């Protein structure tokens, strides 16, 4: 009976082939008609080439070229010392190399392959059909491939690419993308690394639980620092606002006092001038009247003296009243003008203070690299003002701000500031 089967080679198998007319594969009994020494064996090297006459063990041309080498299968070749080639077309070319499987190739010293058409180079291990590894690599799985040195590919079609030395690809179709790396997928196939313990050293991986704790800790610290910075900023802003308001009030009061002093001086001057003018006018009129009366009285006879005196008294009285009335009217007019000017001055001072309060309500930008737009209102007594402004914080230490306030009519106030902190 003839059957196709897979065969494992060992010292026990070799002994069985010499000592028994029977061999077993997959628990089926196989009969050998003979076991013969190949004519290709070197008689001086004590090498045995197994070429059983039974078809189940392969065909002809098995070749073992060195001592302790074994070749089993049609065209199997074991080229170096202690090399083993098992399977049709299998090749073991290196010292201590092992090639098991049809068309498998162990192409360097200590290379090991297991699987159809698998290939391993020096010190490499390839397990699985069509598995391939370069020097000092390990490829496990169908069509797994290691093209870099000292690397490992485990899984169906897993691949360590050229120049990706010292890398590992684990899992179906996993691929590496750099040196000294471990890949468990590829660009379009990502996998999770589960049941990972928390890292303890700087070079350990971090699991999600550790990451969450660090994020929470960082958030707490960030909130604490933000609160501290905000408190400092608010305190600074409050102090500066109070200082600015106090300065504005002081300046307004100084301006008001100056204006009042000027108004008083002007009023006194006008009143003095008016009084002097009235007095001069009255004296002049009185002198003219008296002169006329004297002339008139002198021209009359003495019997008309009493009449002249009476007439003179009446005339002088009327002239004096007229002069006083004109003087009072002029003085009243000047004082009304002064009152109007003072009222306008009070209004302008109130509007100025309202504008200053509105400008002081504008916020300074806090975020670095941020531009803000802010608006505010202010009032003083019966006056109100609207202010708008904008600012920009260049960095943590430098900020710019400008604003404009409008209190009605043509009353506009503006300011601009530059802030440096250290």
Curated annotation (Swiss-Prot):
Keywords noted in UniProt: Cell adhesion, Cell outer membrane, Coiled coil, Membrane, Plasmid, Protein transport, Signal, Transmembrane, Transmembrane beta strand, Transport, Virulence
Coiled coil region boundaries: 206-236
Compartment(s) where it occurs, according to its Swiss-Prot or TrEMBL record: Cell surface; Cell outer membrane
Domain of life (superkingdom): Bacteria
UniProt-listed GO biological process terms: cell adhesion; protein transport
Transmembrane is among the record's keywords: yes
TM annotation in the entry: 369-379, 383-394, 401-407, 411-422
Chain spans, region Surface exposed passenger domain: 26-330
Outcome, altering residue 389 to S: Forms trimers that dissociate fully upon heating, the membrane anchor domain (residues 335-422) trimerizes very poorly
Keyword set includes Coiled coil: yes
Location of region: Outer membrane translocation of the passenger domain: 331-368
Recorded GO MF terms: collagen binding
Region of interest (Translocator domain), residue spans: 369-422
InterPro entries recorded: Adhesin_Head_dom, Coiled_stalk_dom, OM_adhesion_Yersinia, Pilin-like, Serralysin-like_metalloprot_C, YadA_C
Signal peptide bounds: 1-25
Main location: other
Cellular component annotations (GO), alphabetically ordered: cell outer membrane; cell surface
Record remark on domains: The signal peptide, cleaved at the inner membrane, guides the autotransporter protein to the periplasmic space. Then, insertion of the trimerized C-terminal translocator domain in the outer membrane forms a hydrophilic pore for the translocation of the passenger domain to the bacterial cell surface. The passenger domain is probably exported as a hairpin structure, with all 3 strands of the trimer in the pore simultaneously.
Subunit structure comment from the entry: Homotrimer; trimers are very stable, not disrupted by heating at 95 degrees Celsius for 10 minutes in SDS sample buffer.
NCBIfam families registered for this protein in UniProt: YadA_autotrans
Further information: Expression of mutant proteins in E.coli is improved in a degP deletion, suggesting the mutants are susceptible to degradation in the periplasm.
Family: Belongs to the autotransporter-2 (AT-2) (TC 1.B.40) family.
Role, per record: Collagen-binding outer membrane protein forming a fibrillar matrix on the bacterial cell surface and phagocytosis resistance. Promotes initial attachment and invasion of eukaryotic cells. Also protects the bacteria by being responsible for agglutination, serum resistance and complement inactivation. Gly-389 plays an important role in this protein; replacing it with increasingly large polar residues decreases expression levels and trimer stability.
Name of this protein: Adhesin YadA
Lineage per the UniProt record: Bacteria, Pseudomonadati, Pseudomonadota, Gammaproteobacteria, Enterobacterales
């Amino acid at each position: 009976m003839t059957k196709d089967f897979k065969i494992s080679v060992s010292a026990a198998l070799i002994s069985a082939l010499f000592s028994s007319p029977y061999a077993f594969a997959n628990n089926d009994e196989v009969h050998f008609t003979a076991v013969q020494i190949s004519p290709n064996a070197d008689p001086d090297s004590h090498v045995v080439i197994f070429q059983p006459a039974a078809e189940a063990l392969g065909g002809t041309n098995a070749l073992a070229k060195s001592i302790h080498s074994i070749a089993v299968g049609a065209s199997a070749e074991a080229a170096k010392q202690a090399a083993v080639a098992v399977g049709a077309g299998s090749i073991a070319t290196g010292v201590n190399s092992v090639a098991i499987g049809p068309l498998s190739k162990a192409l360097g010293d200590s290379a090991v392959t297991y699987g159809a058409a698998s290939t391993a180079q020096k010190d490499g291990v390839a397990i699985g059909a069509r598995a391939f590894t370069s020097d000092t690599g390990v490829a496990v799985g169908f069509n797994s491939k290691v093209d870099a040195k000292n690397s490992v590919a485990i899984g169906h079609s897993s691949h360590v690419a050229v120049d990706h030395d010292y890398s590992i690809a684990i899992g179906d179709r996993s691929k590496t993308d750099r040196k000294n790396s471990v890949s468990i997928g590829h660009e379009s196939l990502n996998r999770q690394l589960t049941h990972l313990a928390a890292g303890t050293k700087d070079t350990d991986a971090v699991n999600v639980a550790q990451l969450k704790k660090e994020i929470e800790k960082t958030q707490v610290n960030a909130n604490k620092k933000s609160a501290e910075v905000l408190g400092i900023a608010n305190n600074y802003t409050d102090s500066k606002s109070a200082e600015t308001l106090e300065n504005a009030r002081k300046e307004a009061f100084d301006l008001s006092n100056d204006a009042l002093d000027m108004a008083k001086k002007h009023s006194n001057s006008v009143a003095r001038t008016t009084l002097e003018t009235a007095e001069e006018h009255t004296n002049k009129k009185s002198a003219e009247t008296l002169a006329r009366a004297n002339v008139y009285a002198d021209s009359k006879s003495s019997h008309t003296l009493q009449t002249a005196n009476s007439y003179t008294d009446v005339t002088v009285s009327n002239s004096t009243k007229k002069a006083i009335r004109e003087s009072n009217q002029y003085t009243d007019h000047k004082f009304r003008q002064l009152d109007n000017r003072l009222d306008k001055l009070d209004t302008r001072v109130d509007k100025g203070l309202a504008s200053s309060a509105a400008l002081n309500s504008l916020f300074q930008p806090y975020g670095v690299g941020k531009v803000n737009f802010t608006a505010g209102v202010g009032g003083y007594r019966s006056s109100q003002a609207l202010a708008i402004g904008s600012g920009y914080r260049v960095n943590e230490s430098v900020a710019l701000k400008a604003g404009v306030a409008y209190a009605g009519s043509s009353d506009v106030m503006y300011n601009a500031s530059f802030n440096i902190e250290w």
